[in-house]
Regions:
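Bacterial Sec signal peptide processing site at the extreme N-terminus
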Residues: 16-33
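Solvent-exposed, flexible loop/coil segments flanking beta-strands in beta-rich domains
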Residues: 29-61, 66-67
Length: 172
């Protein structure tokens, strides 16, 4: 029995990699008549570390599009087992460095030793296209004393591309 479980785990890691999806990905239109806002949002465009040094930490990078203002945002939500106190996010898109400041206003203890840090960052269309259409995108979360690298954003990037090519044209 143990051999079968080990083999099954090994096959799963080979086919799905060390980062698994987190949550159920979807796209929703979030309209609020009280605030007169209308956003098209990715929900749960995340990866989760699994069976490595990043075990069970979740990294979400959702695109938000303000339909009324015709502007885009990156909603970054990091749920980890320890604090980074994120100050900035650095992407490498085919080697080109793209740096975003990260607000220190959005931090919380989720419970059970889990912490969350998030921000909604404005992003212009040219920069968004660089991230979406680059051959390889990596990311570094720079904290006050530490940093953390994500070297495989292919699942997130694939969903960005689908969102950009199929969902956004309906509202532009």
């Amino acid at each position: 029995m143990t051999k079968h479980l080990t083999l099954l785990l090994f096959i799963g890691l080979v086919f799905f990699g060390c980062y698994s999806g987190a949550g159920i990905y979807s796209v929703k239109n979030d309209s609020d008549p009280y605030n007169e806002t209308n956003f098209l949002k990715q929900v749960d465009n995340c990866i989760m570390g699994f069976m490595n040094e990043d075990n069970a930490n979740i990294y979400c990078m959702n695109i938000y599009y303000d339909i009324n203002a015709k502007s885009s945002y990156l909603n970054i939500d990091v749920t980890r087992d320890n604090w980074l106190f994120i100050k900035q996010i650095i992407f490498l898109a085919d080697g080109e460095k793209i740096v975003f400041p990260f607000s220190n206003k959005h931090r919380d203890v989720v419970g059970g030793g889990t912490v969350s840090e998030w921000d909604v960052i404005p992003i212009d269309e040219d920069t968004l296209k660089k991230l979406i259409f680059a051959g390889k995108v990596t990311c570094r979360f720079v904290g006050s004393n530490y940093y953390h690298d994500l070297n495989d954003l292919s699942k997130i990037q694939s969903r960005w591309k689908t969102f950009f090519n199929t969902e956004l044209p309906k509202y532009r």
